[in-house]
From Swiss-Prot:
One of its GO terms (biological process) is dTMP biosynthetic process. The lineage of its organism: Bacteria, Pseudomonadati, Pseudomonadota, Betaproteobacteria, Nitrosomonadales. Its EC number is 2.1.1.45. It comes from Methylobacillus flagellatus (strain ATCC 51484 / DSM 6875 / VKM B-1610 / KT). One of its GO terms (molecular function) is thymidylate synthase activity. Catalyzes the reductive methylation of 2'-deoxyuridine-5'-monophosphate (dUMP) to 2'-deoxythymidine-5'-monophosphate (dTMP) while utilizing 5,10-methylenetetrahydrofolate (mTHF) as the methyl donor and reductant in the reaction, yielding dihydrofolate (DHF) as a by-product. This enzymatic reaction provides an intracellular de novo source of dTMP, an essential precursor for DNA biosynthesis. This is Thymidylate synthase. GO terms for cellular component: cytosol.
Length: 264
C-alpha cells in the first residue's frame, strides 16, 4: 500500500494547519488521488491491523438501506455509535440515499438497483453514478456523507469505480473507505459478470488530525507486507443477497493495530 503511505507523507510535509468542526485541528491538503489495481490484491492496509469485520458489516448495512445502528450493534460493530441518537437513528444517511432517494412525487429511487441495471444494459454509459449527497437532506443527517459520490466505468470487460470523498480522515477513516469501496466494486463486478479493474479514490479535504501525528509517524516506520486476497462466494448473483459469510480474506499478514482517538 505504498500509495497510501505516500498520501500520509505528502500531508505531513505539505499540509496546511486548519481548524475543524471537532475542534481538534488538522494538517490538510485539498485534492489528492490514489489508484488501486484490484487484480493485484485486496487493498487492506498491512502496516496496521484493520478491523475487516466492521468494514464488511457496514457495507452490508448500507446496502440494506438501513439508517439505524441496530444491525451493526447486533454484529459487534461500534463505528457509528458516537453519532447515533438514543434510539440508534442517524437520519437519512448513506443507506437511505443509496436505496431510497426521495422523489418530489413521494416515491423513491433505488440507486443501487438502477446503477447495476444500467451497467448490464449499457456498460459504456457515463451515468453509472450513485450519490449520497442529497442537499435537501444534509441538515437532517447526524453526519453528512464524507464519501459522497461514486461512479462506475467499464472497459475491456473490467469494472472500475471512482469515489469522490469530500472529507477524508486519513489515519482512521480512509483505510476503511479504501477497503469498503474495493469490496463494493468486487461485488458489483460479480453480479454484472465483469472482471476487476481499478478503484480510484479522489479526496477533497484530505487531513490528518493533530492528535494522530505520532500514530501516522509510527505507521510510516513499518514495512508493508504483500496484499491479501479477498474471496467472494461465486454463487451470489444478487447484490442484496450477500451475507458476511460470503467473504473470506486469505493471506492477510499485518503489523499490530495502532489506537487513535476519533474526532466527533
Amino acid at each position: 500500500m505504498k500509495v497510501y503511505h505516500d498520501l500520509m507523507r505528502h500531508v505531513l510535509e505539505q499540509g496546511h494547519k486548519k481548524e475543524d468542526r471537532t475542534g481538534t485541528g488538522t494538517l490538510s491538503v485539498f485534492g489528492y488521488q490514489m489508484r488501486f489495481d484490484l487484480s493485484e490484491g485486496f487493498p487492506l492496509l498491512t502496516t496496521k491491523k484493520v478491523h475487516l469485520k466492521s468494514i464488511i458489516h457496514e457495507l452490508l448495512w448500507f446496502l440494506q438501506g438501513s439508517t439505524n445502528i441496530a444491525y451493526l450493534k447486533e454484529n459487534g460493530v461500534t463505528i457509528w455509535d458516537e453519532w447515533a441518537d438514543a434510539e440508534g437513528n442517524l437520519g437519512p444517511v448513506y443507506g437511505y440515499q443509496w436505496r431510497n432517494w426521495p422523489k418530489p412525487d413521494g416515491g423513491h429511487i433505488d440507486q443501487i438497483s438502477e446503477v447495476i441495471a444500467a451497467i448490464k444494459r449499457n456498460p459504456d454509459s457515463r451515468r453509472l453514478i450513485v450519490s449520497a449527497w442529497n442537499v435537501a437532506d444534509v441538515d437532517k443527517m447526524k453526519l453528512p456523507p464524507c464519501h459522497a459520490f461514486f461512479q462506475f466505468y467499464v472497459a475491456d470487460g473490467k469494472l472500475s469505480c471512482q469515489l469522490y470523498q469530500r472529507s477524508a480522515d486519513i489515519f482512521l477513516g480512509v483505510p476503511f473507505n479504501i477497503a469498503s469501496y474495493a469490496l463494493l466494486t468486487m461485488m458489483v463486478a460479480q453480479v454484472c459478470d465483469l472482471k476487476l479493474g481499478d478503484f480510484v479514490h479522489t479526496l477533497g479535504d484530505a487531513h490528518i488530525y493533530l492528535n494522530h501525528l505520532e500514530q501516522v509517524k509510527e505507521q510510516l516506520s513499518r514495512e508493508p507486507y504483500p496484499l491479501p486476497v479477498m474471496r467472494i462466494n461465486p454463487e451470489v448473483k444478487d447484490i442484496f443477497a450477500f451475507r458476511f459469510e460470503d467473504f473470506t480474506l486469505e493471506n492477510y499478514q499485518s503489523h499490530p493495530a495502532i489506537k487513535a482517538p476519533v474526532a466527533v
